[in-house]
Amino acid sequence: MHEQQLSDAEPPKPRTGVNLRGLAQVTIGVGALALVVMKADTRGLVNALEHTRVSYLPVAIVASFAVTWLMAYRWGTILAAKGVRFKTSRLFPYYLIGVFFTSFVPGGGVSGDIARLIYVDREVRDKALVLSTLVYERLIGVFTLLLIGLIATLMTRAYGQADPRIYVSEAVLAIAFAAILILMSGYVSARLARMIRFIGQRIRAVKVAEAAARTLEAVTELRRDWALLMKTAAISVVIRIVWSLGCFVVASAMGLPLDLLTVFAFISLIDLVRLMPISVGGLGVREWAVVVLFATVGINREQALTFSLLAFAPIYLNAIAGGVAYVFRARISA
């Protein structure tokens, strides 16, 4: 790969016009956040902030950037399995740009994935191949999230937390885990690819259907590589550990009565909510999830809201860094 090719890559262009789905996501996110803030006691929020040991928070910031770096490394590992080699240091800015789009542009994680797809495809010139690595990365990431979350939730209940909402959490994680296992099945993927091609012929969208089917088949090929599966799963476990430890540091800074297992379980559930394309970057919906889950262990709304703001603020620092990288690359290519 040539450095000049990267410099000349044009950044993804935002679409013009009214996006009703995006508008709905913004409205839901802002509305949900406004509602949870309005229901909170201002004095309680100030008190929670005043009793937070700010000196702990840089650790959470470092952890969040380390997670983004590890995600870029995982993606590079998947690309290398397809014969496309990128240094992690070159994928890292693309991942930051992806975080920027995910956090501030309607569309959820899809927006960030599209941004990364466009940048890397400028060099690879094979959208189906790059897309297959993104889909595989999503699957392995969600698989690990659900697995760790389910184990942590079961262990949390074993230690005596038997709130009915814990049982509901277990059911949600178990169902989602089973769904991911089915999607990762080669048997299911092969039949989905055939069905997509058939539908494409019927609705006269053969090219689009063929691209989607090729992507599914490429993902299936990646899944057959057991060495890659084990390596990316191990990286994903490390990512979950680092991210959850960063959140645990925030909980410790606030003096919240949360043990490490509970943080692992709760953060997995909250991240699952964040993945849903309900609001931009999970804004608002994420805060409600934190409030509901923390209530099961006796943490009040104000403390839960403060935790959410402090624990997820580092993601926005990643997003801002991604925005700077986006503008910088746009100026280079201008």
Regions found by a protein language model. Name each.
Residues M1-E50, F101-A205, S279, L283-A334:
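Transmembrane helix-loop-helix hairpins in multi-pass inner-membrane proteins
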Residues R15-V18, V46-R53, V84-K87, E123-V124, ...:
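Helix-boundary and loop/linker segments of multi-pass membrane transporters
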Residues L23-A24, L57-I61, T88-P93, Y167-V172, ...:
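Hydrophobic alpha-helical transmembrane segments
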Residues A32, M71-I78, R116, W243-V250, ...:
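Hydrophobic/aromatic residues in alpha-helical transmembrane segments
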Residues L57-I61, F65, Y95-F101, L131, ...:
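Hydrophobic faces of transmembrane alpha-helices in multi-pass small-molecule transporters and flippases
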Residues A72-I97, V250-A265:
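Membrane-embedded helical hairpins/re-entrant loop segments and their flanking transmembrane helices
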Residues R90, Y94-F100, M195-L216:
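Juxtamembrane inter-helical linkers in multi-pass membrane proteins
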Residues V208-A253, L260:
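Alpha-helical transmembrane segments and their immediate interhelical loop/hinge regions
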